[in-house]
Amino acid sequence: MKPKRTILCVDDNEQSLSIRKVMLETRGYRVLAYSDAQQALQRFAEGGVDLVLTDLIMPGFDGSKLIEGIKDISPETPAILLSGKVKIYERETGADVFLAKGMYAPVELLERIRLLLVRKRGPKRAHHRVHAQGPPHHIASA
């Protein structure tokens, strides 16, 4: 059985967090849900997270600070930032994907997650059978 990929999901809105958690779990992902970005960063530092999905606007420690902290620890970890604010300057956050809340279908979010996880894993490698056999050996007779 293929191991589940782990997504760290962060949003101060408990209802939004719960909806995303259920949506992702029904698609086979393991979800670590946090409503506090600082606690989420502490959990991320423990390891085992494959992707981060976070809201931008949160009290105190916002999503862009969370992503900055995550990229400091693990630059290759993909991050998706969700926000109701769509100003251009807010797109410069270090996130791999920026989605405006209410402007995407859940299927688009799921596809972005899938693609980022594939990209993180890298291209599939061709598995070549390696033969331990070298050139034929000649045995000299005495």
Predicted regions and their residues:
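Non-catalytic signal-transmission and effector/linker regions of two-component phosphorelay proteins
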Residues: 1-6, 107-142
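Active-site residues of response regulator receiver
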Residues: 55
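Short hydrophobic/Thr-rich beta-strand motif most characteristic of the beta2 strand and flanking loop
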Residues: 28-35, 43
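Short amphipathic alpha-helix used as the core "switch/output" element in two-component signaling
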Residues: 42, 64-76
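Acidic catalytic/metal-coordinating carboxylates
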Residues: 35-36, 62-65
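Receiver (REC) domain active-site loop signature in two-component systems and cognate sites
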Residues: 58
